[in-house]
Amino acid sequence: VFEQVRRDSALLGELDLTLRVTLDTHVHADHVTGAWLLRQRTGSRIAISQDSGAEGADLYLSHGGRVEFGQRYLSVRATPGHTNGCASFVLDNEAMAFTGDCLLIRGCGRTDFQQGDPHVMYRSVRNEIFSLPDDCLLYPAHDYRGLTASSVMEERAYNPRLGGQLSESDFVGYMNNLHLAHPRKLDIAVPANLKCGAPEGDTVPMGDPDWAPLNFNFAGIWEINPDWLEEHRAQVQVLDVREPDEFTGPLGHIPGAILIPLGALQHRTDELDKERPVVAVCRAGGRSAQAINVLQQAGFAKAANLPGGMLRWRSQGRRVEGGAS
């Protein structure tokens, strides 16, 4: 998802993973894919079905093809019905499959627009997904109830649209009478996804903060580079959210730091200047991460955490006031 690329990039960095390929299961209608932006940030390739109608991909996939990574691969299964270009991806040992919007958990993708066809959908699920081993885990593109995985055995038995003894005519009758409203982002998402998520003019609209060299972690917190902070302390407000005895204790504190314990911060944010950046610090970086959430809720647009806190700051031999010598 385009808006989640920063989060996804953070996870890749934290786990020291290299993104080789971004697989789009189809041209989505309810959100814009992050494939293009991920390619801009990581150099990954974009892969999508050759029947999708999308432009700008690096790999166009066909039924029976493979997407290789390391010593493993995903096999490509064409599963149209939601759209013409829907594809599902099955791990080489058939232990798991990624079904896009073809088969959802106790449901399936809609078939009433974007080349949708309930007859085709029924056959795709029955022939390409329900034919997998019972214990094959199924991961759909999304789920509106917060679920993440099911299995072939479960869906074959309990899917209220496609499971059990339901026939093709049963399924077609069900799908033709859903009477769903069109997705809210339809007019934005489909044109963008037909370009693999590339924005107009190929300009990146999600610029990172530029007031300091920051890193966005998977927990959703901006973190500041300690070297930059030491050199530019006068340009920011250093907020120490420890308790008073810690502030004057063995670790000392960063020169010029403002002491506001985390428990009091929500009611004392007016002691800080919203126009100037704030860097939060604590003993090890945990409380100060929560301080960033408090500051953002109070309207501070420029706020970052000092990872590792005073423990790391002291261990690197950086300047402090007070503390043990």
List the predicted regions and their residue ranges.
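Catalytic core of the metallo-beta-lactamase
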Residues: 1-19, 55-146, 151
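Accessory terminal helices/loops
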Residues: 123-137, 141-227
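Short, polar loop motifs at secondary-structure junctions
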Residues: 47-54, 242-246
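Positively charged, proline/Ser/Thr-rich regional signature most characteristic
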Residues: 202-280, 323
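Catalytic cysteine-centered active loop of the rhodanese-like fold, especially the PTP/DSP P-loop
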Residues: 262-315
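Generic beta-sheet signal
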Residues: 47-50, 100, 141, 306
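Active-site metal-binding motif and surrounding structural segment of the metallo-beta-lactamase
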Residues: 2-47
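Active-site neighborhoods of enzymes that stabilize oxyanions during catalysis
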Residues: 317-325
